[in-house]
């Protein structure tokens, strides 16, 4: 095993300057039914193939992701956050009561430190509502 003396100072410095803060805000949601997408409407109450994969929203164009990142680097949550949605109950229905589902949302970009405030309960609720409204569109 190497000690810090075995590693060049320039390398140690570059490693210590890496920002490991996460730009992701994860939201876990309990649903009383599967999401119904306009692009591929549900034909039954059973999961369809698109429910069984990762669903990406608000990333149809690179510019959308860039703007979300720019918002976060300015200390604001993204006005139109990129969303990765996973519905694990579409593959394993034992994770929720019959007819219900679990939805996992990985949203980007959400800065750890906000320029105009803190992540208090009200701010978290506002951000979650922004995400839900974005999904509903």
Residue ranges and their predicted role:
Residues 76, 81-137:
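FAD-dependent oxidoreductase catalytic-site/capping-region signature
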Residues 1-96:
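Mid-domain catalytic core of redox enzymes
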């Amino acid at each position: 095993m190497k000690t810090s003396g075995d590693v060049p100072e320039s390398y140690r410095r570059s490693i210590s300057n890496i920002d490991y803060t996460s730009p992701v805000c994860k939201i876990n949601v309990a649903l009383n039914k599967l999401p119904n997408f306009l692009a591929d409407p549900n034909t039954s109450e059973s999961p369809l193939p698109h429910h069984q994969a990762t669903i990406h929203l608000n990333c149809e164009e690179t510019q959308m992701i860039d703007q979300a990142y720019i918002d976060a680097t300015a200390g604001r949550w993204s006005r139109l956050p990129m969303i990765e949605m996973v519905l694990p109950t579409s593959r394993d229905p034992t994770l929720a009561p019959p007819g219900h589902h679990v939805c996992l949302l990985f949203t980007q970009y959400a800065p750890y430190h906000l320029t105009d405030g803190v992540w208090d309960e009200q701010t978290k609720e506002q951000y979650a509502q922004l995400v839900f409204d974005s999904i509903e569109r």
